[in-house]
Amino acid sequence: MKGTFLICLILIAGFSFKSTQAGSICLEPKVVGPCTAYFPRFYFDSETGKCTPFIYGGCEGNGNNFETLHACRAICRA
């Protein structure tokens, strides 16, 4: 019984941490980066509450950089 409770507690803590991480990623600014590649991506615009397309240069980005609109919406719940 104690083991089951402990496992449930660990799972809940893990999901809470993952949710917090995802939320903070969505608040990061759009970073195009200094490189000159041309990668169409999406970022979550926290001011509009929407996933917005942008061109990523290929280096020095952050977590708010999604390959698809679906991925952006799934993580940031837009």
UniProtKB/Swiss-Prot annotation:
Keyword entries, A-Z: Disulfide bond, Nematocyst, Protease inhibitor, Secreted, Serine protease inhibitor, Signal
Keyword Disulfide bond: yes
PROSITE patterns noted in UniProt: BPTI_KUNITZ_1 (PS00280), BPTI_KUNITZ_2 (PS50279)
Subcellular location: Secreted; Nematocyst
Record CDD domains: Kunitz_SHPI (cd22618)
Disulfide-bonded cysteines: 26-76, 35-59, 51-72
Region forming the signal peptide: 1-22
Site (Important for the stabilization when complexed with trypsin): 67
The keyword Disulfide bond belongs to this UniProt entry's keyword annotation: yes
Domain BPTI/Kunitz inhibitor: 26-76
GO molecular function annotation: serine-type endopeptidase inhibitor activity
Sites annotated Reactive bond for trypsin: 36-37
Record GO cellular component, one term: extracellular space
Family: Belongs to the venom Kunitz-type family. Sea anemone type 2 potassium channel toxin subfamily.
The protein's role, per its UniProt record: Serine protease inhibitor that specifically inhibits trypsin (Ki=73.8-78 nM) and chymotrypsin (Ki=993 nM). In vitro, it shows cytoprotective activity in the oxidative stress agent 6-hydroxydopamine (6-OHDA)-induced neurotoxicity model. In this model, it decreases reactive oxygen species (ROS) level, and increases cell viability in a correlated manner. It is possible that the observed effect is due to the ability of this peptides to act as free-radical scavenger.
Miscellaneous comment as given in the Swiss-Prot or TrEMBL entry: Does not inhibit potassium channels (Kv1.1/KCNA1, Kv1.2/KCNA2, Kv1.3/KCNA3, Kv1.4/KCNA4, Kv1.5/KCNA5, Kv1.6/KCNA6, Shaker, Kv2.1/KCNB1, Kv3.1/KCNC1, Kv4.2/KCND2, Kv4.3/KCND3, hERG/KCNH2) and TRPV1, the capsaicin receptors. Does not inhibit the serine proteases plasmin, thrombin, kallikrein, the cysteine proteinase papain, and the aspartic protease pepsin.
Name recorded for this polypeptide: PI-stichotoxin-Hcr2e
Organism (species): Radianthus crispa (Leathery sea anemone)
Higher taxonomy: Eukaryota, Metazoa, Cnidaria, Anthozoa, Hexacorallia
